[in-house]
């Protein structure tokens, strides 16, 4: 299957092996939850928390250890962000590109890139509103430059 905004094809990748907790993990459930909470309170985004748990603590997946995903742990502890991380990153990218286009109005390639980022954001907002992650009254124009 092809990628969305390019002519390149997708790349096949390895699949995660889900199942029981691996035998090499030395941490209890409480220690893993405390580590997640401490990392989030220190300002680390959820995707980086997963990478740190994998690389520094030897925990391949939070779901295998705790039985629930990282986002669920954060929402139970009241540490979930108002805007999902992927949408927030797209908003930052859009604002940076929009600022660049204001300074360089003849840069047609980045104008197109800005439009593609906006299209992706609109699709994500529609999905998050449909699934209940974002409130129906949430508006994208409030967070854009």
From Swiss-Prot:
Any idea which UniProt keywords this protein has? Ribonucleoprotein, Ribosomal protein
Q: Which GO terms describe its molecular function?
A: small ribosomal subunit rRNA binding; structural constituent of ribosome
Q: Which GO terms describe its biological process?
A: translation
Please give the Pfam families that the UniProt record associates with this protein: Ribosomal_S13_N, Ribosomal_S15
Give a yes or no for keyword Ribosomal protein in this entry: yes
Annotated GO CC locations: cytosolic small ribosomal subunit
The entry's family comment says:
Belongs to the universal ribosomal protein uS15 family.
Query: Per its UniProt record, what HAMAP family does this chain match?
Result: Ribosomal_uS15_A
Please identify the protein, giving its name as recorded.
Answer: Small ribosomal subunit protein uS15
């Amino acid at each position: 299957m092809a990628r969305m905004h390019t002519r390149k094809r997708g790349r096949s990748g390895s699949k995660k092996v889900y199942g029981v907790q691996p035998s090499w993990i030395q941490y209890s459930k409480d220690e893993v939850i405390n580590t997640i909470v401490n990392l989030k309170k220190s300002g680390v985004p959820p995707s980086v928390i997963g990478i740190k748990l994998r690389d520094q603590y030897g925990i391949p997946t939070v779901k295998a250890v705790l039985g629930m995903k990282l986002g669920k742990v954060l929402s139970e502890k009241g540490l979930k962000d108002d805007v999902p991380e992927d949408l927030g990153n797209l908003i930052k990218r859009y604002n940076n590109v929009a600022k660049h286009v204001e300074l360089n109005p003849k840069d047609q390639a980045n104008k197109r890139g800005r439009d593609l980022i906006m299209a992706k954001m609109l699709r994500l907002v529609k999905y998050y509103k449909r699934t209940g992650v974002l409130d129906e009254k949430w508006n994208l124009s409030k967070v854009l430059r």
